Amino acid sequence: MTVSFLRIEIQNCSAGILRFLPRNPDLFAAIKPSSALASLYSTVSGQIEENPKRYEHHNVATCIATLQRCAQRKDYVSGQQIHGFMVRKGFLDDSPRAGTSLVNMYAKCGLMRRAVLVFGGSERDVFGYNALISGFVVNGSPLDAMETYREMRANGILPDKYTFPSLLKGSDAMELSDVKKVHGLAFKLGFDSDCYVGSGLVTSYSKFMSVEDAQKVFDELPDRDDSVLWNALVNGYSQIFRFEDALLVFSKMREEGVGVSRHTITSVLSAFTVSGDIDNGRSIHGLAVKTGSGSDIVVSNALIDMYGKSKWLEEANSIFEAMDERDLFTWNSVLCVHDYCGDHDGTLALFERMLCSGIRPDIVTLTTVLPTCGRLASLRQGREIHGYMIVSGLLNRKSSNEFIHNSLMDMYVKCGDLRDARMVFDSMRVKDSASWNIMINGYGVQSCGELALDMFSCMCRAGVKPDEITFVGLLQACSHSGFLNEGRNFLAQMETVYNILPTSDHYACVIDMLGRADKLEEAYELAISKPICDNPVVWRSILSSCRLHGNKDLALVAGKRLHELEPEHCGGYVLMSNVYVEAGKYEEVLDVRDAMRQQNVKKTPGCSWIVLKNGVHTFFTGNQTHPEFKSIHDWLSLVISHMHGHEYMTVDD
């Protein structure tokens, strides 16, 4: 029975709908809840007064058609006027479709509360429920859509073929078991062979990585001309790293003449990105250009990501520069590419361009740029980013996002600013093991051994379990601060107390600690007693300690083993050369350099940098490409001349 919209009371609404209505406890008990609908009626009635003759000749069918146009255009103002007109004419009592059209209009305009209120005053049928379910999904409330569907079933109303596609679009709020139940009912009602229902099922199963179920639904569909079906299946296989199956589906799609859309292109590109198949990825790039999808922003973003993951920086940049439109994802992708390829200066330069373009950075942007500031020791830019995070509200004491705090803290540590790093650490509401490890490692590298050990004690008291990285930081702290006994104890406690098996990194720290303390024989014995220690890092550490303490005999042993492990690396040659120089054996120095030439080994050029107001200036040995090279060289020559005049000598002299 149709109930008058003006006389509807909330007790006629179901429990699922009630939660969307006002919850003022004082008013709720004192007045009839129908006031919520009366308020809406008052609003829409006022709209018609603006132009009382505008809808004078409208009948129910005309009003419904007009509401559909309002929904398409998201013109809720005109929709409200039609609503008011329909109320005054009594159309809502005469036609159930009128109420459904109103629900649909308000939902498409994003006014879900009004859609729910109108639904509460309309006759309950499958069309009204479909409009409400679709509205919740479109407006980002899939959980509410699922609850509405359950209420619909509880009221004995059977879904139709339009219910399932809308509901399945909100499968993010479901469990796999829910999808199977929906599938079972669709099969029972005979809708499982419908193209749109099938597409929704394939997509939903793929989201849950249940590709066998998705493939079964796909194979049983009589009509497979919809590219959405194929895209969902390609995505499903890609998500579980079955790239060959994904490409087989794509090949079959093309064989059957199904049109390739931008979603198809991005689905296949994602498969090639993860698998690292750059050659086939380039073929898809060509297909995108051929089909007119090459300039699409989503496709361009996927191409940047694919080329970047393969370290094809030039190609990724070329696509980026050719884009007419760039969104936040575009900028984040190209920033990640430059950072991944080691172009740290380029990363910061792009970040400046991003800010100038008016795009506001998000957490992803900042956690990409902050490590770059740390690698370049660009403290000024790191502090500017920190300030932006505070002003924009991305960083506050109530935030539970440890990752962004850890990135900020790590930047300060790498820039040598332990005071600000500790300030960020102390401001964190929740600290995970990474937070403690960053501070322990920071104190250790800066030779603040006591502070590192104090931090470890606080970590244990806070109930945070140390891990492998924690002990790397502790052993580094002991090495840099000369805490020999403490370092030995930590190595022993790793297995006995914390049940952590030491790795080559831990032994390398201990050997470095022993070498710095002139315990070279003990360091050597440890290195040869543990097969895990037979690596270049350990032998390079021993060789460096031999140079420090003038142990030429052990240096020869370490240098020989280092040469055997990495004959093409310059580090061992340089260390041996320095050992011979300090021992005054210049003929051996020449022999080492001859060996480097024969092996075609080149010394890695030295690098230094300085942070000025206009950015970071980097200098490499023998490189003359800096725009101010001549001026800098002239000033440097003048300084050296003054040094010689005061009887100082440079290192080269």
From Swiss-Prot:
Family: Belongs to the PPR family. PCMP-E subfamily.
Chain residue ranges for the region called Type E(+) motif: 614-644
Molecular function per GO: RNA binding
Keywords: Repeat
Region Type E motif, annotated ranges: 538-613
PPR repeat start-end pairs: 59-93, 95-119, 125-159, 160-193, 194-224, 226-260, 261-295, 296-326, 327-361, 362-396, 401-431, 432-466, 467-497, 503-537
Protein name stated in the entry: Pentatricopeptide repeat-containing protein At3g14730
